[in-house]
């Protein structure tokens, strides 16, 4: 078992523009909360499986296409994302496949995947589009919500950021969230 109980794995390639959205979310949690590791999952695939091993709970955040109605939408998957989602980058296997294999192997007790709808992926482009940046912020809020659910006590900068019970309508370009079971 790892020292820290929770891993936040960001996937993507920051040199492919919007594909780097998952990495941006992960970076927001680096050093932010004791008991939580922020992990660069690279471009995902089979390499995710050993990264998950030994954690009680893992959140995987990745750029995805075909999951939202508009760019910046955020979807929280309590079960592996559909295996027929179109790939949005050059992963050797999809996130859904990696999650399914990790669950089958018993690598981790609970895995939640957060997808950010990114639309087009542009090669050799740094930074994300403004609507995707809104999705990054919405995904950050979803990770904070999960950490509040999973941890006995709030930690670090999460202490003052407990998510509210009401649903807020996001401003244009700020992403919206929904849960798929």
Question: What does each model-identified segment do?
Answer:
Residues 3-8, 14-80, 154:
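Nucleotide and nucleotide-moiety/phosphate-recognizing core
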Residues 9-10, 148:
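Short beta-strands and strand-loop turn motifs
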Residues 10-15, 84-87, 125-126:
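A short glycine/serine-rich beta->alpha loop
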Residues 20, 24, 43, 90-97, ...:
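Conserved active-site and cofactor/substrate-binding residues in soluble primary-metabolism enzymes
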Residues 64-111:
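Helix-loop-strand module that forms the ligand-binding subsite of alpha/beta enzymes
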Residues 97-172, 176-181:
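Phosphate-binding/catalytic loops
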């Amino acid at each position: 078992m790892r020292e820290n109980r929770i891993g936040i794995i960001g996937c993507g390639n920051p040199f492919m523009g919007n594909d780097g959205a998952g990495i941006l979310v992960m970076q927001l949690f680096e050093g932010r909360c004791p008991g939580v590791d922020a992990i660069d999952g690279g471009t995902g695939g089979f390499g995710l499986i050993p990264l998950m091993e030994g954690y009680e709970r893992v959140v995987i955040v990745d750029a995805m296409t075909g999951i939202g109605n508009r760019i910046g939408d955020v979807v929280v998957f309590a079960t592996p994302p559909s295996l027929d989602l179109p790939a949005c980058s050059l992963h050797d296997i999809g996130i859904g496949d990696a999650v399914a294999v990790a669950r089958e192997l018993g690598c981790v007790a609970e895995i939640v995947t957060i997808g950010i709808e990114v639309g087009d992926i542009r090669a050799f482009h740094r930074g994300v589009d403004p609507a995707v940046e809104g999705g990054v912020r919405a995904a950050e809020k979803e990770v904070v919500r999960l950490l509040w659910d999973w941890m006995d006590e709030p930690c670090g900068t999460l202490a003052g950021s407990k998510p509210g019970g009401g649903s807020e309508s996001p401003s244009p370009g700020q992403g919206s969230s929904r849960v798929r079971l």
